Amino acid sequence: MHRLITIGSWALIILLFLQPGIAHKGSVEGIRIFTTALLPYLLPYLVITQLFIRSQNSFLNTTSKFKLYFNIYLLSAIGGFPSGAAVITSLKDLGTLNKSNASWLLAICHAPSPMFVIGFVGIEIFHTQIAGIKLLLIIHAVNLIFLLVFILSSPPIHEKTHIQKLSDSPFQESIKETYQILLLIGTTVIFFTTVSFIVFESVKEIFPNIPSMLLVFVASLFEMTGGISLAGEMLSGSMFLPFIVAVIIAFSGISIHMQIIVLAQKANVPIRKYILFRFLHILIIPILFFLL
C-alpha cells in the first residue's frame, strides 16, 4: 500500500509539472465548488447540528436504541454526506456513541442531500423531479433496512453512570468544531477536484478517441458532482443514463470518501464497515433504480 501511494504521488507530481495550467484550473474549480455549492449549505447546518448535539435533550439523550439510532439517521439524512459523518463522529467524541456503534452508523447513515438528488439529479439530469424522488427513496429504503437489522442485533443502551458536564459555551464550541470540519472538507474537495482535472485531461490527451462511458468513469472516480454532470451531457437520452447516475451516486467518489474517512480517523472510528457497505450500495441501489 505504501509503495502504491508513493508511485501515485510521484505520478501526480510529474503531471502537476507537465500541466500547471490545468492544475490551476482544477484548484480554482475546487474552490468554486466548495465556496458556492458546499460552504453556504454546510456551514449553517453544521453549526446548528453541532449546537444541537451538545445540548442535553431527549432527542439524543435516551436509552432507547430505536429512538437514538433512528434520530441519528434522521439528522444524517437531512444533511446528506459528509454532514452525517460529522454528526456521528461528534457524537462519538462526546461519548454518546461507542466505537463499534459509531462504525456501524457511519456505514449505514450514508446518503446524499435530498436537495442534491431531487433538485440537481432529478430536475437537471433526469429532467423530472419524480425520478430524483424515486432514487432518494430507494437509497433511504436500503439504508433503513440495514439500520433496522443493526438496531435489532445491537445490545441495549445502558444508562450512563457518568453525567457529562454541560458546556459553558456550546455555541463557541460548535463554531470551533464546524471550522475544523469545514477545513478538512474544503481541503479534500479542492485537492481531489484538482486531481480529477489533471487525470481527466491527461486521459483525453493520451486517448483522444476514448469512449464517452470511460470519460464519465474517470470524471466520477474522484468527484461525484462532476461525473454526474458529464454523464448528463454525454449520455443524454440514453436508456442507461439512470443506471450510470445511480452507480455514480452509490459510489460517491473518492473525494466524498476521503472527507468521511478523515473525519472518522480524527474520532478514532473504524472504517472497515463503511467500505463494505459502499460495495453493497454499488451492487444494490443502481439495480433497484433501473428495474423499478
Role assignments for model-derived ranges:
Residues M1, H24-I33, L68, S100, ...:
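Juxtamembrane/transmembrane-helix boundary motifs in multi-pass membrane proteins
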Residues I5-V47, L135-I210, L283, I287, ...:
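Selected transmembrane alpha-helices and immediately adjacent juxtamembrane segments
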Residues S9, P40, P44, I48, ...:
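Hydrophobic faces of alpha-helical transmembrane segments in multi-pass integral membrane proteins
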Residues W10-I13, G30, F34, V47, ...:
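Hydrophobic alpha-helical transmembrane segments of multi-pass small-molecule transporters/permeases
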Residues F17-V28, L51-L60, G119-V121, F126-Q129, ...:
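Transmembrane helix-loop junctions in multi-pass membrane proteins
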Residues T63-L68, L148, L152:
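Short, non-transmembrane cytosolic segments of multipass membrane proteins
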Residues S64-F126, F217-Q265:
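Alpha-helical membrane segments and immediately flanking helix-loop junctions
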Residues L97-F150, Q259, L263-I287:
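Membrane-core helix-loop-helix motifs of multi-pass transport proteins
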